[in-house]
Amino acid sequence: MEGSARAPGRVAVTTAGLRGAQWDRSALPPDVRISIETLRTHDGAAVTGFLMARGGERNVVCAMHPREMNPAHYLAPAVLAAGSAFWVQGSRTPNVDLRLEHETALLDMAAGQAFLRALGFRTTVLMGTSGGGPLAAFYCQQSARRPQERIEHTPAGRPVKLASADLPAPDGVILVSSHLGQGPLLQSCLDPSVADEKDPFKIVDALHPFLPANGFRPPPESSVYSADFVGRYR
């Protein structure tokens, strides 16, 4: 939602998340080689990654999402064409939201970073798309801390071995269509215009985001909401 005035003819434009673009194998350089690697994390879990390289690269871009395993990442061809290798990996619990713990996913990412450093890559850059963005930021925060200052337990109380783990620090971060984290994302999905949880059709018009009077415009126009409406809605 925006609080600024709507410009004439303004059209909504979004960037592509993991599900907003298509994989095009024909766009890969013809000399690319793809290897599949299974790694062990510091706490003994197994994770899988895909390394795409043409040979001789000193830099590698690393894509990881906490929930999705996406070896067919739509940005791989562009990264390879620019002269860097491309690494994409999953967590220990791909595609299973109920078992995902971001704290242990940091150990999964660390296994990938250690593997790439051992291969001799001089520079590693994390690329976080959608939910991969806050995961990359979380990893950078924990890797920059002294071991004794790292998180010791998940929110549910499960011990996590970040203090004794090697968390190789990346040299950079790229955020693509990133959100602020799973908690803020889910919280923003709550609809305050629903007056009664037992009756989802009972709506408070003053908070209804799809009423033209509140700023809604049908596509392809962009909806624009006043700062007052956004404040009350949030």
Annotate each predicted stretch with a short phrase:
Residues 3-59:
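N-terminal cap/lid segment of alpha/beta-hydrolase-fold proteins
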Residues 55-58, 63-70:
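Active-site glycine-rich loops that stabilize anionic/oxyanionic intermediates
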Residues 61-63, 86, 173:
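Hydrophobic beta-strand anchors of alpha/beta hydrolase catalytic cores
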Residues 76-100:
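Conserved alpha/beta-hydrolase
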Residues 92-125:
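Catalytic nucleophile-loop/oxyanion-hole region of alpha/beta-hydrolase
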Residues 127-137:
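Gly/Ala-rich beta-loop-alpha elbow adjacent to hydrolase catalytic centers
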Residues 138-171:
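Conserved hydrolase catalytic core segment
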Residues 159-234:
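Alpha/beta-hydrolase-fold enzymes
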